[in-house]
Regions:
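Hinge/beta->alpha junction and helix N-cap segments in small-molecule ligand-binding domains
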Residues: 1-3, 52-62, 78-129, 145-152, ...
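A structural micro-motif
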Residues: 35, 49, 110-112, 163, ...
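Periplasmic-binding protein-like
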Residues: 10-19, 76-79, 114, 136-147, ...
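Venus flytrap/periplasmic-binding-protein-like
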Residues: 38, 104, 148, 157-175
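Alpha-helical recognition/docking segments in bacterial nutrient-uptake
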Residues: 1-65, 69, 133, 137
Length: 175
């Protein structure tokens, strides 16, 4: 079964491995076909289902520590918004939450250095252009980018503005 294919076409299901972001309604629909559910990339522990998710906390803190160890204190983020596959529920990006919390704890968080849009190269491009226009000489020295697609657009905007990576600004992207 892929994406929005109908589960009703299946006569017998022993278990389901569901990949993606799912709303509570979608989880309940899947439960009707099999109690043996495992979710990948969707935290469903609070709904009583096993799941496999990325340890964003470790990844984000590792990246931020890398920047901090280099003496970089002005760190920005280009993030994206996600939603469930049925489009009914917005999902907070755990990378962004961790980024804000970690830098706030160190009294280094600058809201003006954070931009949020869609997970696309075009969005990365537009968000970085906005940051360049708004910050001018006050640009962060490093950026944590929440996806490779966003990073592609970010790099294009930096290149167009004559900002050299990694000489002027460092970036690390993590999907």
């Amino acid at each position: 079964i892929f994406n929005n294919d109908s589960l009703s076409q299946l006569e017998r299901i022993d278990g389901i491995i569901a990949i993606g972001k799912f709303s509570s309604k979608q989880v309940k629909e899947l439960e009707q076909y099999s109690p043996a559910l495992v979710f990948v990339d969707s935290d469903t522990l609070d709904q009583g289902h096993s799941c496999v998710t990325t340890d964003f906390e470790h990844a984000v803190t590792h990246v931020l520590d890398h920047f901090l160890q280099q003496g970089i204190r002005e760190i920005g983020m280009i993030a994206g918004r996600e939603e469930t596959t049925d489009g009914t529920t917005s999902i907070d990006d755990p990378r962004l939450a961790c980024f804000c919390r970690y830098l706030s704890d160190k009294e280094l968080y600058q809201p003006a250095y954070v931009k949020i849009g869609k997970f696309s190269s075009e969005s990365g491009y537009q968000l970085m252009k906005e940051l360049i226009d708004q910050q001018k000489e006050q640009m962060p020295k490093a950026f944590f980018i929440a996806s490779d697609a966003l990073a592609v657009g970010t790099l294009r905007a930096l290149q167009e503005a004559g900002i050299s990576v990694p000489q002027d600004v460092q970036i690390i992207s993590f999907n």
